[in-house]
């Protein structure tokens, strides 16, 4: 360390300013001591200087000037700037070294810096929004207080006018003659006075409340700002709160969707119940229709056997009549036709037979008459069969046997006739 030398020098103000302007920047003291043999004061050293003052003065003023170059605050600024430059150079070298060595760390650092910048931008925006909200709230409170003050200022004037009016009314009431004649009026005035006193108390209470409102605004504002700053210092907590709020909103939306689905399911259940009722009604109707069809079939079956029984009896009677040789030739053809109709009703005579049955069903009276006629014919045929049969001569019997086949051979021409009838129906 170099030794400090203080020399008292008295200079005029003009010379002191020239010295300050012309002094070169500071240099390391060790180099100066080596190069210059003459000892000089070190940099940034205070030197007392006596400056002349106009006019007679008992006490001489002493001024302290810096001998070499630069004042203290400028030296400190220069030293700080040099230190910052060295730090920046050192940081730049470290960054270059890191870039050359670890590109992954560089990317991570850049991402971290971007995230920090984004968070800082978000925090600044939130601060602006909060400041705007605070300004709006303060403006609203100021408006409310202004309106209350106006009301309070207007209200005392009205009260003062009422008090004066009451005082004027009380003066004539002091007379004993008037007091004795106006008791009700006095009671009314006393009530008004009590009401005015209550209003005064309310005014005082309102004034106290205004004072309390004005103070908390000033007290609570810094607390509120501190809370906001703390919140801004912890963005992670804010992000967690935001995530929680988003999750709660999603849960609410999910619950609303579930409620809508439940309502839709309830509607579908009602529709299903209605459909089940309709299906039950349809099944009941189908059962009724099946019962009706079954009844119709039974009716048809009941009507057909009567005709078939009558026809079978008629055929038996005709076969018996065929035993008579005189009637066999004319009745064989008739029997063949009837047997063909009875054996093949589905292929040959179904449409006509059905039409006849429908007509008969439409006219039951005619059917009964026909049945009665058939019964009469059958009775006549039975009577004919009961009559004795005369045996023919031997020559005639041979002729008859040659002309007419036996009972077993009667079916052959009937089958041929059935085949002929089928061919005729197909051609038609």
Swiss-Prot record:
Residues 77-92, 209-218, 298-311 have a biased composition (Low complexity). The gene is IVL. Part of the insoluble cornified cell envelope (CE) of stratified squamous epithelia. GO terms for biological process: keratinization; keratinocyte differentiation; peptide cross-linking; response to UV-B. Residues 1-128, 140-398 are annotated as: Disordered. Keywords: Cytoplasm, Keratinization, Repeat. It comes from Cebus albifrons (White-fronted capuchin). InterPro entries: Involucrin_CS, Involucrin_N, Involucrin_rpt. This is Involucrin. Belongs to the involucrin family. PROSITE patterns: INVOLUCRIN (PS00795). Residues 56-76, 107-117, 162-174, 192-208, 220-297, 313-327, 352-366, 374-385 have a biased composition (Basic and acidic residues). Directly or indirectly cross-linked to cornifelin (CNFN). GO terms for cellular component: cornified envelope; cytoplasm. Substrate of transglutaminase. Specific glutamines or lysines are cross-linked to keratins, desmoplakin and to inter involucrin molecules. Pfam families: Involucrin (PF00904), Involucrin_N (PF10583). Keratinocytes of epidermis and other stratified squamous epithelia. It is found in: Cytoplasm.
């Amino acid at each position: 360390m170099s030794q400090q030398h203080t020399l008292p020098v008295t200079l005029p103000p003009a010379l002191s300013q020239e010295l300050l302007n012309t002094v070169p920047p500071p240099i390391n003291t060790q180099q100066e001591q080596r190069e210059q043999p003459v000892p000089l004061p070190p940099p940034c050293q205070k030197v007392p200087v006596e400056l002349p003052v106009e006019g007679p003065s008992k006490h001489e003023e002493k001024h302290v000037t810096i001998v070499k170059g630069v004042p203290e605050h400028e030296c400190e600024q220069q030293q700080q700037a040099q230190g910052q430059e060295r730090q920046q150079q050192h940081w730049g070298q470290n960054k270059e070294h890191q870039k050359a060595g670890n590109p992954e760390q560089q990317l991570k650092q850049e991402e971290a810096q971007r995230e920090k910048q984004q968070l800082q931008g978000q925090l600044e925006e939130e601060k602006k929004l909060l400041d705007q909200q605070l300004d709006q709230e303060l403006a609203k409170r100021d408006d409310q207080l202004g309106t209350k003050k106006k009301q309070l200022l207007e209200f005392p004037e009205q009260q003062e006018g009422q008090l004066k009016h009451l005082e004027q009314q009380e003066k004539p009431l002091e007379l004993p003659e008037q007091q004795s004649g106006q008791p009700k009026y006095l009671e009314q005035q006393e009530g008004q006075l009590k009401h005015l006193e209550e209003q005064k108390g309310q005014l005082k209470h309102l004034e106290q409340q205004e004072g309390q409102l004005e103070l908390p605004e000033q007290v609570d504002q810094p607390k509120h700002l501190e809370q906001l700053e703390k919140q801004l210092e912890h963005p992670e907590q804010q992000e967690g709160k935001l995530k929680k709020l988003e999750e709660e909103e999603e849960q609410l939306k999910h619950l609303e969707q579930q409620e809508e689905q439940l309502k839709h399911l309830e509607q579908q259940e009602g529709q299903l119940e209605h459909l089940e009722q309709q299906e039950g009604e349809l099944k009941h109707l189908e059962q009724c229709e099946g019962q009706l069809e079954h009844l119709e079939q039974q009716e048809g079956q009941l009507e057909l056997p009567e005709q078939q029984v009558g026809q079978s009896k008629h055929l038996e009677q005709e076969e018996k009549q065929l035993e008579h040789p005189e009637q066999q030739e004319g009745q064989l053809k008739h029997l063949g036709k009837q047997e063909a109709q009875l054996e093949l009703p589905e292929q040959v005579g179904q449409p006509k037979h059905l039409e006849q049955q429908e007509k008969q069903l439409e006219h039951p009276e005619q059917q009964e008459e026909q049945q009665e006629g058939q019964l009469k014919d059958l009775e006549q045929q039975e009577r004919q069969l009961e009559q004795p049969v005369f045996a023919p001569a031997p020559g005639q019997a041979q002729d008859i046997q040659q002309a007419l086949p036996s009972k077993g051979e009667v079916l052959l021409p009937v089958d041929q006739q059935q085949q002929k009838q089928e061919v005729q129906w197909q051609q038609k």
